[in-house]
Amino acid sequence: LAQGINKYSKRKMEHDILISLGSNHDANNNMQHAHEALRRKFVDASFSRVLSTEPIGIAGPNFLNCLCRVHSSLPLQEIIAMTKLMETTLGDSREKRQKGCIAIDIDILRYDDLRLHPSDWQRPYIPQLLADLSEE
């Protein structure tokens, strides 16, 4: 029994993480590359379907959006840094964003019970995509 307790206590806590992805520039290609990048970092990555949505708060073409659920023992700040690096690697930049061109936007919506990006939770497509992930 003591051996089992020791073994259990050495396991790192896996955090339940919900990630949103969006793109309105070369969207199919950028979403595919973002999916691949997330799968390389998180072997258990599961994705919702991809929805086309009208832009909210910016002028520009429609977006492709989806959600991704992963588990990791990494702290929140490391996950955020990783996703921001993915954005840059996939061609996103502040200059392009100012022109309404979003190559890829990768945001952490939830880290365990902590909700981030409160306005994103109000977007009508989020519940639809969440339902996809809960049906798995």
Please provide the spans of the model-predicted regions.
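A residue-level signal for conserved active-site and pocket-lining positions in enzyme catalytic cores
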Residues: 24, 47, 68, 129
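N-terminal amphipathic/basic-hydrophobic helices that include classical n-h-c signal peptides
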Residues: 1-12
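N-terminal beta1-alpha1 ligand-phosphate binding loop
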Residues: 14-41, 48-54
